Amino acid sequence: MEDLKISIRSIIVYELIMIIGSMIMSSFDITSDNKLAQLIGNSIIQLISSGYIVYIIKKFYKLENIGFSKIKNDKLVWFVPYIFILIPMLYKFIEGIYKNISYFNSTILISIVLIFIGTVIAGFSEEIMFRGMLLNTLKGKIHLISAMIISSLGFSVMHITTIFAGKTLIQALVNVIASSLLGFAFVPLAIILNNILPLAIFHTLWNFIIIASSTMGINISKVYLFCNPINIIISIILWTIIIKKQKKSTFSKNKLVFSEKLINSI
């Protein structure tokens, strides 16, 4: 159970750093007018919290234990819908930058760099924590479906903490709902793909395009609106497949337990 304590403690400490950092920024009124100062502050907080996760990984984990095992290339077909969403978003985003780059000042360019760094660090950290450390630890100890549910809910509930970053309660709840849809789709994807790298890349690029385009006033493809419906469809299909496979697995001490053969058969 020690590894489970480590993963849970790591998530809690990560979140506490983010919350305390956001509260400090709010107390100094950093988030009110100066957007660049806000981005710099957020980047520092993110670097500290993610630096802690890197420390934990180096001390306690191997890459395969946090979701970076050999990817199942034949299962990438399940990830294709997300690629179809990302490509037009990325195209419109790059097109918008190209058309407006002559109007960008140094502040905007620095902001883009900070947003990119922040979204890369946050995207990979969140995937490693919930679809890497927590999911991989739990699925070896409890019912696989229970492990998936805990990982999904943990990821979504974590986003309520955005209220400490200046979001209203309604905005935070909307964020939780959107994160829930993504979480319940990405957990079975992580299991089927046997690797979280595609998920972390999508997570990073999605956040970067959404945040950067809003900051720069660039219109992106409306195809992003299909993400939630796709999350729902992928969730229903993959959860159904895994649950059916789980029912066929073996019982041990009257409790259905995780089986490598089960995962490999999906």
Descriptions of predicted regions:
Residues 12, 125-152, 191-195:
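Membrane-interface helix/loop boundary segments of multi-pass membrane proteins
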Residues 204-266:
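C-terminal membrane module of polytopic membrane proteins
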Residues 8-12, 77-79, 112-113, 145-150, ...:
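Hydrophobic alpha-helical transmembrane segments
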Residues 30-40, 61-128, 135, 140, ...:
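Juxtamembrane helix-loop-helix connectors linking adjacent transmembrane helices
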